[in-house]
């Protein structure tokens, strides 16, 4: 089971980093969890890149090994308080995207698998540090998607109507 979970997380990371680099995926269409992750994590990543632009402009990542070291140091600090939630898990993917974009463009061009190497250490960190929490909180399909998938207007309308009826019933 752990191996299949790691493969699933690795696939999510790989698809996300392909999305960041705008590398066309030649496989089947991404899963719903993958699409939601791309939308949410990329939004977080853009916000981080905008807010920390002056810092990131002077921030250099010379190699995949350097990216791995920086990633592990930052994530260790981020999770030292032991608090895990879906928002923090999304930031792991987003930070992987930031680091990948900071690699020298020549290296990414020469090493077309750079995103695969980054996705490996992102997936390993997620599995080793948040895997149990993910399982306990519904997994990617029942936990993550429900947390971040926007509700349709019709569904929201029905929920609001139900709440209004509940309030009217309580007022009687």
Swiss-Prot record:
SUPFAM superfamilies: Bcl-2 inhibitors of programmed cell death (SSF56854). A motif (BH1) lies at residues 77-97. Pfam families: Bcl-2. The keyword Cytoplasm applies. It is found in: Cytoplasm. Interacts directly with BCL2L11/BIM and PMAIP1. Interacts directly with BAK1, BID, BMF and BBC3. Interacts with BOP. Interacts with isoform 3, isoform 4 and isoform 5 of ING4. Interacts with UBQLN4. GO terms for cellular component: cytoplasm. Belongs to the Bcl-2 family. Its main location: cytoplasm. A motif (BH2) lies at residues 132-147. This is Bcl-2-related protein A1. Transmembrane segments: none annotated. Induction: By granulocyte-macrophage colony-stimulating factor and LPS in macrophages. Retards apoptosis induced by IL-3 deprivation. May function in the response of hemopoietic cells to external signals and in maintaining endothelial survival during infection. Can inhibit apoptosis induced by serum starvation in the mammary epithelial cell line HC11. The lineage of its organism: Eukaryota, Metazoa, Chordata, Craniata, Vertebrata. It comes from the Eukaryota. GO terms for biological process: B cell apoptotic process; B cell homeostasis; negative regulation of apoptotic process; negative regulation of B cell apoptotic process.
